[in-house]
Amino acid sequence: MFQDLYRFLRTGGLKVYSLGQQDKICTDPFVFIYEAGTEDTSSSKNLKKESIELWVFYPFNEYSKVEDYIKQVENTIKKFGKLRKNYDKYAIEIDNDMKAYYTKLSYFRYVYREGGR
């Protein structure tokens, strides 16, 4: 799923990074994809829940534009259509090292275990 999501977000006009790709000062808004793991479901032995987090970063001194960018990311994920929202609104925090505002958007999907169908 990671590769499909990465490509879809990039095609949607977003700057996207994965683990270890971005460690510099934030000069442009971007999304960091983090695969948050897989867990068993209580409702079915055949399903597992895969979680993914999107960390949304926006440069300092442009706070008034952060919410619009977050909405752009959320709308792009809706168009992707393979993930379900798994969060209430998280606070917008400050990353002084990257000189950016950031927040987290969590999503998940249910997938069949191998041999589970």
Predicted regions and their residues:
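A generic structural signal for ordered secondary structure
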Residues: 14, 18, 28, 55-60, ...
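Generic "edge-of-domain/loop-turn" microfeature
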Residues: 38-40, 61, 112-114
